[in-house]
Amino acid sequence: LEIIPSEDCLPELVEFMKEFAARRLGKGVVIAKDTPNFIANRIGTYAYMQVLKKMPEYGFAVNQIDRITGQVIGRPRSATFRTLDMVGLDTFVYVANNAGQAVEDEKENADFQIPAWLQKMVAKGQLGDKNGQGFYKRVKTEKGSSSLIWDPVAEEYVPPGQEALP
């Protein structure tokens, strides 16, 4: 739980809320400054940005990344790219830009720079679940429907392969 005390907030109230959240709600508490984005968003955005930048470099496919960043490491089944599709690619870009602007260090700021291929996706209207095309896209087939995945190098949707993980 993130608690953001204002200048006018009584220290006793902050302490009470910390204690209440920890004991009654079972929550870990972080005292934060009043800055844009939640702490978890800033940390999560950084982690997602690292994946987005490394994926094409190492030749991973969207579905491969989701297989290794989901339940196998204790994260939700939606993993990385299904989560980004749920959030909305335009929303993620907004949050990442916002987080990057709050960072003063040049190298850290570079970590929040949106990859060109993701900027193109958003510019083309690929927003994720909002409009049915993000990193995943459902298509109708003769046998019903199937999913395609976005290939950032080819800049097109492709069938997901069942490649072995390295």
Q: Which stretches of residues belong to each language-model region?
A:
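N-terminal glycine-rich phosphate-binding loop for ADP-containing cofactors
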Residues: 1-166
